[in-house]
A protein has these predicted regions:
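Conserved catalytic core of nucleotide-sugar-dependent glycosyltransferases
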Residues: 1-64
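C-terminal catalytic/acceptor-binding lobe
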Residues: 53-55, 59-180
Length: 180
């Protein structure tokens, strides 16, 4: 991901898609530009923007860089395995999302970005809904002097199908030390 991002002068944030949004049985592009990047972010540290707020910090940061005319890259070619929101106890589920926390979370983003964000009721809970269409015109721009290589560099990787239990299933395989 970093090698890909380094080709461009204006990619501010990049990261992998959640595996549950990129099912292997579906056809996806290698990446999607100018949308949100959740949880696992590769960030250009020269940005003037910093984390802020209590909720949706990743979405807020993405929206601020997109509004500056920069780009984000969400990779489908690489995914991250993460438990679906509010399916595990602890962390944000207990601290931020209990009681009216889901509504507060959604409303905070709508208040920060009323031009593109609103509160909606989806999946039996309050959610934020962001319209990323205004950022379609943010075009990826190669760095000065970058020459695209000929051919395909697979970096020594092979695509294989692995039928193993999920990292979050109770039957996940562990080694002798108890590590995955």
């Amino acid at each position: 991901m970093e090698d890909f991002v380094d080709r461009y002068a204006n990619v501010a944030i990049a990261g992998p898609q959640y595996d549950h949004f990129a099912k292997s049985k579906c056809v996806h592009p290698a990446f999607c530009a100018n949308t949100r990047i959740y949880s696992c972010l590769l960030i250009d540290n020269s940005l003037p923007h910093r984390w802020r707020g209590r909720y949706n910090e990743d979405t807020d940061l993405c929206l601020r860089v997109l509004k500056d005319g920069l780009c984000t890259v969400l990779f489908y070619a690489f995914t991250q395995e993460k438990a679906t929101t509010m399916t595990m106890r602890g962390g944000n589920t207990d601290e931020l999302y209990k009681d009216d926390g889901r509504l507060l979370m959604a409303q905070s983003l709508a208040d920060q970005h009323p031009d593109v964000a609103r509160v909606s009721w989806k999946f039996n809970r309050w959610q934020h809904h962001v319209d990323y269409r205004p950022f379609r015109r943010n075009a990826l721009k190669y760095r000065d002097g970058y020459i695209p290589p000929s051919g395909i560099d697979e970096y020594g990787m092979r695509l294989v199908s692995v039928e193993e239990p999920s990292l979050f299933s109770e039957q996940a395989p562990c080694d002798a030390r108890g590590l995955l």
